[in-house]
């Protein structure tokens, strides 16, 4: 049953920090409801007749597919604009582009590099803008993560989530702050040189003093409910690969780490794509250069009963749908 519905109409969805605990939990409740409706073939055309621009500076599989299917299910018309279709800040300023798109579209999704770009789109377009990923935050991913955790564990409050890997990336930032807002015990486990920015840590601690930042794997994973990792090198950082491999080898998620939690029901999450074998061109290249058949997670863990990564990937669509419906849709 849905909790009391907050009024989110016309709001942009740029980062978790812009929302209260009640609002984030409402997104999850709505996502669960829409997921059930889709499963049962019940129409939910809350965006009937709306036009949505999907702006992608960065390529994507899950984000693009999730937004496209979500738009279609909600009755909206999605228009994909890749980096070759739109020149944000090159031939036309972001401000001018936002004003043009706002005259033609009812909502805008942006996936790219600078967070300032998505903020400018929101400030100048006059329509709801949704952050599909920036270098700073990845809020639609976090909503999917939270829904997946709640589905498998039954709650969020006091759930111990350990993020292991590059603690400075957008996924870690969003999990740290978003998890703290909903009352989770979030722990970031990474070498000190990759700890989150102090401003992000301070922001998370405003919501929950339990936040832990540590380089000690054993300390971090003790009694964990969720182990989460991401790629060791984000898009645009490929030149740092050799350095990151050496730094993060001790933080690989393997069965030894899973067992160290002491929780036989611990779940494993990853925002994907994951480098857990050599079945890709990238995986082959890494193996040839560094002799690694697995990187941030072993194939054993990835394919184990603990892994919920494909539930998590599916939930991108349901949570994105909830965000669009709540901020743009006719929910009466």
Curated annotation (Swiss-Prot):
Q: Which locations, inside or outside the cell, does it occupy?
A: Cytoplasm
**Full protein name:** Ornithine carbamoyltransferase, catabolic
Family matches, as InterPro entries: Asp/Orn_carbamoyltranf_P-bd, Asp/Orn_carbamoylTrfase, Asp/Orn_carbamoylTrfase_sf, Asp_carbamoyltransf_Asp/Orn-bd, Orn/put_carbamltrans, OTCase_ArgI
Q: Tell me any Pfam family this protein matches.
A: OTCace_N
List residues traversing the bilayer. Answer: none
Q: Which organism is it from?
A: Bacillus cereus (strain ATCC 14579 / DSM 31 / CCUG 7414 / JCM 2152 / NBRC 15305 / NCIMB 9373 / NCTC 2599 / NRRL B-3711)
Primary residence = cytoplasm
Which reaction does this enzyme catalyse, per its entry? carbamoyl phosphate + L-ornithine = L-citrulline + phosphate + H(+)
EC number(s) reported in the record: 2.1.3.3
What does this protein's UniProt record list under function? Answer: Reversibly catalyzes the transfer of the carbamoyl group from carbamoyl phosphate (CP) to the N(epsilon) atom of ornithine (ORN) to produce L-citrulline.
One of the GO BP terms on file: citrulline biosynthetic process
Q: In which pathway does it act?
A: Amino-acid degradation; L-arginine degradation via ADI pathway; carbamoyl phosphate from L-arginine: step 2/2
